[in-house]
Amino acid sequence: MECFVGIDLGSTTTKAVVMDDKGQVLGRGITNSRSNYDTAARVSKLEAFIDARLSLIRRELDKEPAVAGRVDEIIDGLTRNFRREQFIEQLGDLEQTCVANVEGPRFAGKEKAIVGALTEVFRRLREEEADKLFAPDAQRKSDFFRDLAGSRFMQIGEEVARANGVEFDHLLHMYDKSIIEVENRPPSADMNRKFRSAMERVRGEMSSALDTAALGAPIDAALEIDMSERYVVGTGYGRVRLPFPKEHIRSEILCHGLGAHLMYPKTRTVLDIGGQDTKGIQIDDKGIVVNFQMNDRCAAGTGRYLGYVADEMNMGLHELGPLAMKSTKSIRINSTCTVFAGAELRDRLALGDKREDILAGLHRAIMLRAMSIISRSGGITDQFTFTGGVAKNEAAVKELRQLVKENYGEVQINIDPDSIYTGALGASEFARRAVVEA
């Protein structure tokens, strides 16, 4: 099976989409962009091919009468247990790297104790935490290895350090130094072994409720399908750093416009708010860009701004929207500048304003800035599509809907659950057209 890949290298996350020769999306992958763009591109592409393999497995399972009505449950189990296999593999890599980094005069005479403490920390992570993180009902705030391993390493590391008379700072130093090395080494691409191990765990989880023998043939058939990468197109904030020839690079404006058109063919106006920029794009009925505007010079009012606000308030980025939705009044925020955001935020808190009201004001300020950019690009024409990571923020969406109605009346607003992949989707379609329509 020939596959066409689009990679969108953003300032905070890198996304990839795998498409077949008919234009059908097979898989999507995402990772944090890191300092090494080459690695981010490889990891996101690997993640997209993993997701594509799961799509093929789903197709084969849909043909099997014995698992009718249970396919979603089986795919969920395979996905969870595949991620568990990946997590354990990367834990092993992280442990070896941490142990190898226990050297130098700072640790002289303490090496054995530090290595012993590290060994115990990683034993507990493997034997106690892996099953909890990937249990059927587990709620994970992130799927990135750094986040999953880091939070548990800190807690267990403190306990082990106290019990073994080792300075916790030494363990923390090992982790901080080693996680960068591990992140810049993509996980092994040995998908088949991991899927087969995951399948055995799914059989154990579902053995009392399902003829698990029926799982083997469909999954084996899907794993045997050869998926070959025919053409790749890269786009995004860091596209000039992608390891591709010039002819394999496309503007992020073109890719977002085409991607939005593929999601919603009647789209005429696109707003994309990403980690580093805000784009207002006008497209025609074929997805061709006819006009656009972007934020100038700085990252004010973008995802990076929200990330800075989250850090200032000691919250997770995903918590900002839900808290802002609890607001009873919106406070006027004078600046969406990242540099001054902290100062104004602290001033508002000192005046006694509630955090949720401040956040509501911040979200409105962001969307007012976005509306200004859209206006300069030509305004909003029905239909209107909102894309990018900020499109997952419910408070931002609420403010956008209100502002659109106030300024343009009743307009259909499209927000796809996978809107963060819009640029990568457009890039994958450019890759497909480069071959199929050549």
Swiss-Prot record:
One Pfam short name: BcrAD_BadFG
pH dependence per the UniProt record: Optimum pH is 7.2-7.5.
InterPro entries: ATPase_BadF, ATPase_NBD, Benzoyl_CoA_Rdtase_A, CoA_E_activase_dom, Dehydratase_Activator_Redct
Gene3D superfamilies reported for this sequence: 3.30.420.40
EC code(s) of this entry: 1.3.7.8, 1.3.99.n1
Cofactor: [4Fe-4S] cluster
GO biological process, one term: catabolic process
Top-rank lineage group of the source organism: Bacteria
UniProt entry keywords in alphabetical sequence: 4Fe-4S, Aromatic hydrocarbons catabolism, ATP-binding, Iron, Iron-sulfur, Metal-binding, Nucleotide-binding, Oxidoreductase
Reactions this protein catalyses: cyclohexa-1,5-diene-1-carbonyl-CoA + oxidized 2[4Fe-4S]-[ferredoxin] + 2 ADP + 2 phosphate = reduced 2[4Fe-4S]-[ferredoxin] + benzoyl-CoA + 2 ATP + 2 H2O; 3-hydroxybenzoyl-CoA + AH2 + 2 ATP + 2 H2O = 3-hydroxycyclohexa-1,5-diene-1-carbonyl-CoA + A + 2 ADP + 2 phosphate + 2 H(+)
A GO molecular-function descriptor: metal ion binding
Residue sites binding [4Fe-4S] cluster per the record: C298, C337
Cofactor: record remark: The iron-sulfur cluster may be a [4Fe-4S] cluster.
Assembly: Heterotetramer composed of A, B, C, and D subunits.
Chain's role: Catalyzes the anaerobic reduction of benzoyl-CoA and 3-hydroxybenzoyl-CoA to form cyclohexa-1,5-diene-1-carbonyl-CoA and 3-hydroxycyclohexa-1,5-diene-1-carbonyl-CoA, respectively. The enzyme also reduces other benzoyl-CoA analogs with small substituents at the aromatic ring.
PANTHER family, per database record: BIFUNCTIONAL PROTEIN [INCLUDES 2-HYDROXYACYL-COA DEHYDRATASE (N-TER) AND ITS ACTIVATOR DOMAIN (C_TERM), BIFUNCTIONAL PROTEIN [INCLUDES 2-HYDROXYACYL-COA DEHYDRATASE (N-TER) AND ITS ACTIVATOR DOMAIN (C_TERM)-RELATED
Name assigned to this protein: Benzoyl-CoA reductase subunit A
Organism in which the protein naturally occurs: Thauera aromatica
Organismal lineage: Bacteria, Pseudomonadati, Pseudomonadota, Betaproteobacteria, Rhodocyclales
Gene for this chain: bcrA
